[in-house]
């Protein structure tokens, strides 16, 4: 799909999930999208790419805890597309294991099949804050796609 389509889907998916949350909950979405990027209208992104990140953030956050939060950042420039999702981990949850679940492995497999080495995916936990970061090097991927 195009990056524009993925961003539109992501924003709609976030709005649907926000209905489940108190208006006082610390929920932030930031976008830095360069709509003049040559990749903005290109069909270059896997469909539903952001869904795993957002679903996991909602699944593993304790909305009753005062200091809980979810932060989502989407960024597109002339070289890359990046999704970063941060959330305070629920103390009731057992997410602290370092390996991801089946959805996480499936996403990584899909990324590897399509983007080969033109992406980086990291997941870290520090001080009960889970950070998932995906960066796709669109320039490298697009160049390889059109030279092979």
Predicted features, each with a name:
Residues 1-131, 135:
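Two-component histidine phosphotransfer core
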Residues 136-148:
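C-terminal end segment of the histidine kinase catalytic
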């Amino acid at each position: 799909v195009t990056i524009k389509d993925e961003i539109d889907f992501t924003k709609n998916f976030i709005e649907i999930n926000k209905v489940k949350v108190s208006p006082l909950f610390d929920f932030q979405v930031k976008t830095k999208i360069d709509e003049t990027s040559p990749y903005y209208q290109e069909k270059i992104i896997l469909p539903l790419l952001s869904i795993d990140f957002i679903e996991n953030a909602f699944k593993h956050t304790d909305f009753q805890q005062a200091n809980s939060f979810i932060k989502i950042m989407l960024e597109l420039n002339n070289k890359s597309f990046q999704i970063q999702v941060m959330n305070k981990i629920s103390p009731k949850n057992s997410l602290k294991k370092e390996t991801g679940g089946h959805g996480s492995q499936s996403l990584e497999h899909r990324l590897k099949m399509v983007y080969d080495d033109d992406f980086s995916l990291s997941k870290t936990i520090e001080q009960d804050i889970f950070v998932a970061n995906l960066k796709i090097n669109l320039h490298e991927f697009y160049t390889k796609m059109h030279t092979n």
